[in-house]
Design a protein with these regions (language model features):
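Short beta-strand-to-turn element immediately C-terminal to the catalytic PLP-Schiff-base lysine
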Residues: 94-98
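Glycine-rich beta-alpha junction loops
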Residues: 9-11, 87-91, 121, 261
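Glycine-rich phosphate-binding loop and adjoining helix at the ATP-binding site
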Residues: 12-75, 81-83, 99-126, 269-274
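Short glycine-aspartate micro-motif
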Residues: 3-7, 56-58, 82-86, 92, ...
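ATP-binding/phosphotransfer module of carbohydrate and carboxylate kinases, centering on a glycine-rich
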Residues: 1-5, 45-48, 72-73, 121, ...
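Intrinsically disordered, low-complexity segments enriched in polar/charged residues with Gly/Pro
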Residues: 80-82, 140-141
Length: 287
């Protein structure tokens, strides 16, 4: 080993030394004492304390890392545009932008720069009652609203809140409704599994419910994941239109995606593909 690379998936400020100064925590992670710490320098110090040889450390956000790893596998003459995306515990996107369009740089120069968009922090998005309830009880109310609608850390809780609302609206038999209203937690993995197969037993509260109730619950969950897919496609479409790419059917724009939610969810990936086809390909002829 001659050097170490770290993917860091929290807000940070890059330094000239290729390190990253932590700016904050997201995705309900709550730590103290992180302010102004350098990820690479702290790791190097700890490794040296444990007797390891000192090695150069480079820290990069996980989304640009996904972009770079994906772009190395695609021939330049194949893709007409490229973007990186992470859909896991959190959500984010990145893309190449002309340097002169990046206002914070204030440079009238040629060339492009890979920009970490931190799209999960987008807040100008319509919220449902479920979104507002989740946001109010989160570690950072009012922040990262887009992430709270589209990422694995929150889709389970959104599904739980939607199921309780459906129970209160009389969509289930009384006994099933009571059990759902008593449901304290629901993970995105269990919600996804149940939404894909109502007979899988992933939600214990619905284990002995009637078939009709289980199917109704699955439809509610599918709606939550389906809305997330629409939001994700809107995010991708924004990059397509911003970069004015994806106009050639035979040289499509490529989006490199990583993250546990996109990789393992049964519901999300096909829903995203369906929405991409309907919105970008069929409606806007972008490929």
């Amino acid at each position: 080993v001659t050097q170490i690379g770290i993917c860091f998936s929290y807000p940070a400020e890059n330094t000239p030394e290729l390190d990253a100064k932590v700016l904050g925590m997201t995705k309900e992670v709550q730590l103290t004492g992180w302010e102004d710490h350098l990820v690479g320098a702290d790791l190097a110090e700890e490794l040296e304390r444990r007797g390891c040889t000192k090695l150069p450390i480079t820290v990069i956000n996980d989304t640009p890392a996904t972009y770079l790893s994906g772009s190395t596998t695609i021939a330049n003459n194949y893709a007409n545009g490229f973007a990186g995306r992470v859909n896991g515990t959190g959500t984010n996107t990145c893309c190449l932008l002309p340097v002169r369009t990046i206002e914070k740089l204030g440079r009238d120069a040629d060339g492009e720069m890979l920009v970490n968009l931190e799209s999960g922090s987008f807040t100008d998005v319509p919220q449902s009652a479920f979104d507002k309830a989740l946001d109010a009880t989160s570690a950072a109310p009012g922040a990262y609203r887009f992430e709270k609608m589209t990422s694995g850390r929150y889709l389970g809780e959104l599904s739980r809140l939607a199921l309780i609302a459906a129970a209160n609206d009389g969509l289930f038999a009384p006994e099933t409704a009571d059990k759902l209203c008593a449901l304290d937690t629901l993970s995105a993995a269990d919600a996804d599994a149940f939404g894909a197969d109502p007979d899988c037993g992933a939600i214990a509260a619905l284990g002995d419910a009637a078939d009709a109730d289980r199917k109704t619950a699955a439809m509610v969950i599918q709606g939550v994941f389906g809305r997330a897919a629409k939001a994700i496609v809107a995010n991708i479409a924004a990059i397509v239109f911003l970069t004015d790419g994806a106009k050639n059917r035979y040289r499509p724009m490529v989006v490199a995606v990583d993250g546990s939610l996109f990789r393992y969810s049964t519901l999300l990936r096909p829903a995203v593909s369906e929405e991409l086809e309907a919105f970008l390909v069929q409606k806007h002829q972008r490929y």
